[in-house]
């Protein structure tokens, strides 16, 4: 609404007005993402750019920060992954087998890097497939949902097209751990937690 220069959301004549709490939460999120400076305030340059992306504001902010931090190639993979249901399947009757199969994708430092490992593994499998039937069989043997992997690729393709329309370029060199996580945190500030490594007795 801000980007369209419409009246303040609190005064707009909605058929069914949103709850005041929802409006407050929305403004708080935009402030967190640096899209506005204050509740009811005008869009910042960051906010104006985010308004051009028909995406969840958090995802849009991650992608924008990734373009600035030379991490867009990696964040496209992660943003599309967290937009769908996890493709890793964990059937109740085969949880140990699924965990063992998924171990090859695990990264000790970051769950986000695990998603990149999984993406690279699936892309390699697709590039070297002998047939679609054998490829799908390989995915199922590794407890991966064929349907969700397809959704992941579709969302990735859509996000990549959007970023190209924005004029953002993919980084040619792999992003560092710091570049990647700095970009991701731009959209996840409200989700940060602190781990206390000292046991409390």
Roles of regions detected by a PLM:
Residues 1-201:
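Second RecA-like catalytic domain
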């Amino acid at each position: 609404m801000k980007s369209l220069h419409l009246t303040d959301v609190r005064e707009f004549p909605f058929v069914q007005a949103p709850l005041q709490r929802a409006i407050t939460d929305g403004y708080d999120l935009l402030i967190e993402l640096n899209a506005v400076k204050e509740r009811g305030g005008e869009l910042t340059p960051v906010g104006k750019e985010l308004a051009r992306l028909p995406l969840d504001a958090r995802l849009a902010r991650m992608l924008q920060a990734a373009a600035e931090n030379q991490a867009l190639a990696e964040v496209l993979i992660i943003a599309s992954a967290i937009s769908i249901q996890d493709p890793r399947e964990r059937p109740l009757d085969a949880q140990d087998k699924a965990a063992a199969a998924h171990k090859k994708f695990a990264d000790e430092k970051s769950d986000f890097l695990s998603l990149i490992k999984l993406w690279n593994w699936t892309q390699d499998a697709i590039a070297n497939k002998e047939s679609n039937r054998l490829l799908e069989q390989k995915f199922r043997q590794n407890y991966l949902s064929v349907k969700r992997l397809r959704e992941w690729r579709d969302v990735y393709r859509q996000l990549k097209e959007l970023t190209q329309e924005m004029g953002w370029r993919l980084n040619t060199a792999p992003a560092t751990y710091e570049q990647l996580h700095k970009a991701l945190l731009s959209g996840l500030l409200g989700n940060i937690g602190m781990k206390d490594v000292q046991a409390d007795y």
